[in-house]
């Protein structure tokens, strides 16, 4: 089974649009393929723009006018019959399913795994009502995954120097690195 480590940047919290989709596919022979898509959208909520720094104008340039539908065949094929691993799977899957439904496509992955939910009882970070969901940087710290290593691996995988936090390329690589660190530490994870 191929494993797809994935992250999205979006127009906001409600299922609007995905503005950036990045993932790393790790095949059964441990070979890796990295993909990054930028999508042109009509509107980005101000709070979302503050987080990821992408305006409608910037996205139009980065995407060269492409929208999600232009990548839907590739995305469907890549996620088909896979294990999709994300940090907050409910959020990413909701946006992906919404975008795919607009293209008359069904969710193609076989199963999902959420590092955020899985590691909540392991990290035991205090919250207002029991343990809080760990942020990705908190999980990285717990698993001893330095941001510099993630940045270097993301640059290598995606072939660019322009990778930073709240960039889906960085975040999906961080999920990959955390997952691999957890496996190396002997923590039980799906494979």
Residue ranges of each PLM-predicted region?
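Short alpha-helix plus adjacent loop in nuclease-associated cores
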Residues: 113-131
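Residue-level "edge-of-site" marker
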Residues: 62, 113, 153
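Acidic, Mg2+-coordinating catalytic module of metal-dependent nucleases/exonucleases
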Residues: 80-90, 95-100, 129-191
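Conserved non-catalytic scaffold segment of RNase H-like nuclease domains
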Residues: 1-109, 138-145
């Amino acid at each position: 089974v191929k494993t797809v480590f994935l992250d999205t940047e979006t127009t906001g919290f409600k299922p609007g649009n995905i503005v950036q989709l990045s993932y790393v596919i790790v095949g059964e022979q441990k070979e890796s393929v990295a993909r990054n898509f930028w999508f042109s959208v009509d509107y980005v909520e101000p709070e979302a723009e503050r987080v990821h720094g992408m305006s409608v104008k910037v996205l139009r340039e980065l995407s060269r006018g492409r929208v999600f539908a232009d990548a839907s065949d590739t995305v469907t094929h890549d996620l088909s019959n896979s294990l999709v691993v994300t940090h907050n799977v409910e959020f990413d899957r909701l946006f992906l399913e919404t975008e795919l439904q607009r293209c008359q496509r069904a969710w193609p992955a076989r199963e999902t795994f959420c590092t955020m939910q899985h590691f909540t009882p392991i990290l035991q970070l205090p919250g207002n009502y029991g343990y809080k969901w760990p942020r990705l940087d908190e999980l990285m710290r717990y698993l001893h995954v330095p941001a510099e290593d993630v940045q270097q691996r993301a640059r290598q995988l995606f072939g660019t120097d322009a990778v930073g936090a709240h960039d889906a390329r960085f975040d999906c690589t961080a999920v990959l690195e955390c997952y691999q660190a957890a496996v190396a530490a002997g923590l039980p994870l799906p494979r």
